[in-house]
């Protein structure tokens, strides 16, 4: 138990030193940098060309959803590749773990599919039109 606690202590000290190192570098750079804002520095840079239009463009959320799904399955490959290289040494328990891992990701993919996040062209919802009813004034004149 003491050895395990000591190992976690080493990891904690390493993480703490990493955070201190990054925060110290960030704060030092922020204190030492000159602050000279001007319109040229704040303008949009387009590979040396003059910017056309606004840089604030709305992107469709579907791009982000597709990118997130790609990243999820890309990370799955990163996790499954080392498992596949040592499959024979790990035995059947590791196979079951890998199948559960892949199954959870497939369930997430099916959920995204059923929800419609994978449909690139979605049908636009149409608002049903109400049938026109005669106004009370029109119906009163017919009597």
Curated annotation (Swiss-Prot):
Its EC number is 7.1.1.-. It is found in: Cell inner membrane. NDH-1 is composed of 14 different subunits. Subunits NuoA, H, J, K, L, M, N constitute the membrane sector of the complex. The chain crosses the membrane at residues 8-28, 63-83, 93-113. The keyword Ion transport does not apply. Signal peptide: none annotated. One of its GO terms (molecular function) is NADH dehydrogenase (ubiquinone) activity. It is an enzyme of class 7 (translocase). Keywords: Cell inner membrane, Cell membrane, Membrane, NAD, Quinone, Translocase, Transmembrane, Transmembrane helix, Transport. Belongs to the complex I subunit 3 family. This is NADH-quinone oxidoreductase subunit A. It is a multi-pass membrane protein. It catalyses: a quinone + NADH + 5 H(+)(in) = a quinol + NAD(+) + 4 H(+)(out). Gene3D superfamilies: NADH:ubiquinone/plastoquinone oxidoreductase, chain 3. InterPro entries: NAD(P)H_OxRDtase_bac/plastid, NADH_UbQ/plastoQ_OxRdtase_su3, NDAH_ubi_oxred_su3_sf.
